[in-house]
Amino acid sequence: MANFLFAYRGGNGMASTPEAQEKVMAEWGAWFSTLGSALVDAGKPFAHCQTVHGDGSRTSGGGSGLTGYSVVDAADLAAATDLAKGCPVLADGGSVEVYATIDM
């Protein structure tokens, strides 16, 4: 088994009302429950971002569209990708990038 990073991209962002936010959180909670012991770290959504450049300068925003992350444990990349198929961000117009991590 190995760890894989789910990088969430896009989606419609934060819900506009407390009721809608509660519904979104319930959807994520339900999906996390289906992952069971494979869920290593539920992660966090991303907020503000700055990019640091090689010359030391920085700019606001990342430009990548990443909106959050989670970490799962799976047998291989294919199994991790299968786990990502139920992610709520997919139904919201977003995508999940699945990255294998390397133990160092």
Set out the residue ranges of the language-model regions.
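Conserved, structured core segments of small domains
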Residues: M1-M104
